[in-house]
Amino acid sequence: MTEENDLEMLEELVNRGISLQREAKHKEAIVCFNKAISLDENMNGEADSNLLRLKNNSLMKLGRDE
């Protein structure tokens, strides 16, 4: 994959995760955020704090913490 493709995929995963959160589908949102976090770590060496926050929001809605 090229960096441009990676950025597009990252954006799609984040947008999908946010949409799922709005639908209260937090387990599915977490899957998207985990993929986005992994991709971001591969691209930048660490995950963006906003991605981690988005995932944490869904975890809290499910009564979980990581």
Q: Which ranges hold each PLM region?
A:
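TPR-adjacent "capping" and linker segments in tetratricopeptide-repeat scaffold/adaptor proteins
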Residues: 1-12
